[in-house]
UniProtKB/Swiss-Prot annotation:
Early fractionation of eukaryotic MCM proteins yielded a variety of dimeric, trimeric and tetrameric complexes with unclear biological significance. Specifically a MCM467 subcomplex is shown to have in vitro helicase activity which is inhibited by the MCM2 subunit. The MCM2-7 hexamer is the proposed physiological active complex. It catalyses: ATP + H2O = ADP + phosphate + H(+). The lineage of its organism: Eukaryota, Metazoa, Chordata, Craniata, Vertebrata. This is DNA replication licensing factor mcm7. GO terms for cellular component: chromatin; CMG complex; MCM complex. A zinc finger (C4-type) spans 183-210. Its EC number is 3.6.4.12. Its main location: nucleus. Component of the mcm2-7 complex (RLF-M). The complex forms a toroidal hexameric ring with the proposed subunit order mcm2-mcm6-mcm4-mcm7-mcm3-mcm5. The heterodimer of mmcm3/mcm5 interacts with mcm4, mmcm6, mcm7 and weakly with mcm2. The N-terminus is required for interaction with mmcm3, though this interaction may not be direct, and remains in a complex with mmcm3 throughout the cell cycle. Begins to associate with zmcm6 at the neurula stage. Component of the replisome complex. Component of the CMG helicase complex, composed of the mcm2-7 complex, the GINS complex and cdc45. It is found in: Nucleus; Chromosome.
Amino acid sequence: MPRDYQAEKEKCKTFLQEFYKDDELGKKNFKYGVQLANIAHREQVALYIDLDDLAEEDPELVDAICENTRRYTNLFADAVQELLPQYKEREVVHKDALDVYIEHRLMMEQRGRDPSETRDPHNQYPPELMRRFELYFKAPSSSKARVVRDVKADSIGKLVTVRGIVTRVTEVKPMMVVATYTCDQCGAETYQPIQSPTFMPLIMCPSRECQTNRSGGRLYLQTRGSKFIKFQELKIQEHSDQVPVGNIPRCMSVYVRGENTRLAQPGDHVSITGVFLPMLRTGFRQVVQGLLSETYLESHRLVKMNKTEDDELGTEELSEEELRQITEEDFYEKLAASIAPEIYGHEDVKKALLLLLVGGVDNSPRGMKIRGNINICLMGDPGVAKSQLLSYIDRLAPRSQYTTGRGSSGVGLTAAVMKDPVTGEMTLEGGALVLADQGVCCIDEFDKMMDTDRTAIHEVMEQQTISIAKAGIMTTLNARCSILAAANPAYGRYNPKKTVEQNIQLPAALLSRFDLLWLIQDKPDRDNDLRLAQHITYVHQHSKQPPSQFQPLDMKLMRRYITMCKRKQPAIPESLADYLTAAYVEMRKEARTNKDMTFTSARTLLSILRLSTALARLRLEDVVEKEDVNEAMRLTEMSKDSLLGDKGQTSRTQRPADVIFSTIREMVPEKGARSVKYSEAEQRAVSKGFTPAQFEAALEEYEELNVWLVNQARTKITFV
């Protein structure tokens, strides 16, 4: 059924003038009337029409707009242009060149023209030239955001919302909307509205005077009288969770104009509402591929999803019921066990991965930046579910990138300088680490990477930036991501006869940047192997973890809780400073006496601080407590013990009582009193990974042997 577009325009005018909402005091608030007044006084440029507001008045008009967006954009713009004089109460103070130009032309025309004379159609001002505002539609809330691969031919010309990640951004350039020409013979002005990406400039003057005199006046382009608008091109790609397994992520070009430019950077997750349109190829490409057409999205509204309307994360507050479900007894163990519940065991590794997802607190004292992100390397024999843990973290993390060592080059991880096909300029295209900004980058087969490519990660792991000096582009990109790497030992399997360095064969500069380096060994053990085999066969039969009293948390709920934890900024109180420094000095002392220990540097202390703040965040606290520091030190000890394997000097293989005894003996000063504070000894034992019960048992055992005495108040341990 043909539409009467004049009547439709009247509907648009009525809506803009009459739509209102009641405020708290019951007064009518004319939402669009206020904005029209701002536009008339040049205080606002972009007018967003919210289709939810229009749906209250006229649902049929909303459907028509979604089906034929381009036409209705012009109808609304014409309606606004006609209404503006009613809202203009005063003269515009700050006028630009185009304002003066248009006013001058109108004045000249009124002076020099006979009232009875009709205006030359070529000299008429096109509406695009007179418009000093931009009009965009905001999609109705009922329309769901689509995936790039779901936008197909049936969406041509319609209003669609697409979600994706920005991979490339061009520079903002002025784009010509109306070309103005002046004739060198008669002085008449001619205007040429431009709708397509290319246009043919007019040469001969079409005015009546030149036609009757046959003077053949030539036209010259007047750039000051022409109208330009800001233009930028984006490339968006599907999110990793939207790509079916084994498929290549799809891309889409987005053309952004006016006030919507400069809103996104490479690596931003965005939701873009716009009109899906085709475009014939032009220039040289038309000769080669003349019958092919390209498609693009003409942007109306661009929203960064990781800042405001992040519907993917579901940032609505957790209800009290959900919070109670998470923060009940042993919630730390429960959250850790909810990570990859199909995988048997690895409790401490899962706890470390949970802390990696939450992250520590960033510090920037006087410009110097101390990172808060936690980096973890999982080293282990083949078949211990390292890659499964990585892929689960990739799915669970709100922002993540998954890549493998052999399949990634140094440029693919950091950033590539590409030649823009439209302008021929060099542009930056972010790599995996840039796209994982404020998220997690999982790198599998880390040991298979080329050494030259691996060096690209050094700067990211400590400074959290990527510095580039390529093809005349000198810049620094943010790469504030946690790195989770999985690697096999140098000989395929871990060889206990070799040292740690010989087995790992990664440079010390890289290893010290990992907060935790975890070795997962596959040792034969009858009871363990039996439980693992039963677990695997059950998972294989039923495609889920075996039934138990423990019910793992839903992935969406965990994601929301992690987002909630990240808002906390816990601080370390001064009372813990001495405790931390003493613990660090002790660790350095152990590293010096034990040659087979891994490298311990000042970064180890920073790692403990990061893990402590992550634990405080997990409890939704604003202050780090001693238990957090003890747990952080326990995880650090456990990761070091995992590297020492079956060696005789490892503390794990000795009896707990013997290790606790040697720990307390080391605390006794060489001269003076041969006693130790009970509380300090207990804290030291707990930080080494022992339970209070084991500590008590060790005290009693050695007291019976008459090695030391514990006083009645249990405040002091004195060596006999």
